[in-house]
Design a protein with these regions (language model features):
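Short glycine/proline- and aromatic-enriched beta-strand/turn motifs that initiate or cap beta-hairpins
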Residues: 22-72
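Detector for outer-membrane/organellar transmembrane beta-barrel domains
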Residues: 133-217
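Transmembrane beta-strands of outer-membrane beta-barrel pores
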Residues: 34-38, 71-75, 121-129, 160-166, ...
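Cleavable N-terminal export/targeting peptides
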Residues: 1-25
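Hydrophobic, lipid-facing positions within transmembrane beta-strands of outer-membrane proteins
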Residues: 28, 50-54, 89-93, 138-142, ...
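Short loop/turn motifs that connect adjacent beta-strands in outer-membrane beta-barrel proteins
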Residues: 21-27, 57-66, 99-118, 147-157, ...
């Protein structure tokens, strides 16, 4: 039986630094998030984290790019040596090929509330120090994408994930079972204001056993 889990990205209001053109546009932004109930492997405590991020999204002739880099700073409950909290860098990259643009007609796959169809490839990458687990996640992914006809963007993707990790507690890199993820990403401008409402939400299926033979959630 599949065990489902959800991850909700913190939606945020950000200052828009965009310059839009018919065939070339980009948006780069910085942000900060804070939470008090983060969890880490083999740690029963709720962990507080400050998360600083740099994000970039851009479009070109055949599709779009998305890059997000998070720096996560934990409190002392996420620490291996009872000192300062652990530090983590988490990188997300997605490249979506737009079938309409590739076909030379942006409206070739437009119907109803759907603006177009595409195919997304990318990866997640992290490295962490200061805690007992010290994750080194590597996760390429790929799958189809539906792009909805809204101001800004609203994309729904079904992605296949190939996740592996090589934590300090395991002698070699371990690969989990390939598993799917349903992901929703959006960036909606707020009228004439220089602000956008942005975020993401993931729904991830079970990835099988962990590196020690136990179940995953």
């Amino acid at each position: 039986m599949l065990v489902k889990k959800t991850a909700l990205g913190c939606a945020m209001l950000i200052a828009g630094l965009s310059c839009a053109h018919a065939a070339d546009w980009s948006d780069t932004y910085v942000g900060w998030r804070y939470g008090t109930k983060f969890a880490e492997p083999y740690n029963p405590d709720d962990i507080k984290k400050n998360i600083f991020n740099l994000g970039h999204v851009s479009g070109y002739k055949y599709g779009t790019n998305f890059l997000n880099v998070d720096m996560l700073l934990s409190d002392s409950k996420d620490s291996f040596n009872n000192g300062g909290g652990a530090q983590e860098t988490y990188v997300v990259y997605r490249h979506t090929f737009d079938f309409g643009k590739i076909a030379g007609n942006p409206d070739a796959f437009k119907f109803g509330i759907v603006r177009g169809l595409g195919f997304t490839v990318g990866f997640d990458y992290n490295t962490k120090s200061g805690d007992s687990y010290q994750s080194r996640k590597r996760m390429p992914l790929a799958g189809p994408t539906v792009m909805f006809d809204v101001p800004g963007f609203l994309n729904l993707s079904v992605l296949q994930l190939w996740e592996s990790n090589a934590p300090r507690t395991h002698p070699s890199r371990y690969s989990y079972d390939a598993h799917p993820m349903l992901t929703l990403a959006w960036g909606i401008p707020l009228g004439s204001l220089p602000l956008t409402f942005e975020g993401f939400m993931n729904y991830i299926a079970s990835k099988g056993k962990n590196e020690f033979g136990g179940g995953t959630k």
